[in-house]
């Protein structure tokens, strides 16, 4: 009996340790929607992590920002308060609901915080426990089933174009960290695909006139949509 209890305790401790080890892969980006900025902070790895399967309910805390600039973003003096609210929500909801924080979305004077959790019991009270310390702010909280992660994928997660920008920025930051001043010329490979050989030939002529070098032009086997490649 004692061995069984010890084994259960060991398994519980191991699960808790694994849960604590997950830190995510965080980044931020800004896009323009209707000529106004949208600021997004997101855990890029959540959607493919075991956490996504374990937590299939989304909790969205919508907070109205009190002082905003003309573009709808918070003024500098309010950022520290917003950070305190964010930290409070993350600490409390992760503690009482084992909720996973996946990111925030800021636009037009409002900041939305996104959590995913398997447990949503008394969620509103848990949010209130934090926000009652910030009585100057108005807020609402929404909960819904979201097993397909539609809120995470459609609201927080970057498009392919934005993801490329994030990866490019990370590469530049890594080079800076290593002391690279980014002054030396570097070879950059571009791969493009076309529906017709004529389209490829036309494009190749334009880029060659601009100083680019075509290294290879081929045809992808088994590809129907855009089989003609250019490197």
Regions picked out by a protein language model, each given a short descriptive name:
Residues 20-231:
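Long, contiguous binding/interaction regions
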Residues 1-21:
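Bacterial Sec-dependent N-terminal signal peptides
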């Amino acid at each position: 009996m004692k061995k069984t209890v010890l084994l259960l305790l060991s398994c519980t401790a191991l699960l808790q340790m694994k849960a604590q080890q997950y830190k995510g892969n965080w980044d931020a980006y800004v896009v323009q929607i209707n000529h106004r900025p949208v600021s997004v902070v997101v855990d890029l790895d959540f959607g493919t992590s075991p956490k996504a399967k374990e937590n299939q309910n989304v909790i969205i805390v919508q907070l109205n920002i009190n002082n905003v600039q003309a573009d709808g973003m918070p003024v500098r003096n309010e950022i520290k308060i917003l950070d305190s609210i964010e930290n409070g929500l993350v600490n409390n909801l992760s503690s009482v609901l084992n909720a996973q924080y996946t990111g925030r979305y800021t636009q037009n004077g409002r900041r939305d915080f996104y959590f995913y959790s398997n447990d949503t019991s008394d969620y509103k009270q848990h949010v209130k426990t934090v926000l009652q310390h910030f009585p100057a702010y108005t807020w609402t909280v929404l909960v819904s089933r979201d097993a397909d992660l539609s809120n995470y994928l459609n609201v927080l997660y970057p498009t392919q174009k934005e993801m490329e920008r994030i990866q490019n920025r990370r590469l530049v930051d890594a080079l800076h960290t290593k002391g690279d001043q980014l002054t030396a010329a570097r070879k950059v490979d571009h791969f493009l695909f076309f529906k017709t050989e004529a389209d490829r030939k036309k494009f190749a002529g334009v880029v060659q006139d601009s100083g680019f070098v075509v290294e290879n032009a081929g045809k992808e086997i088994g590809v129907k949509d855009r089989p003609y490649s250019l490197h």
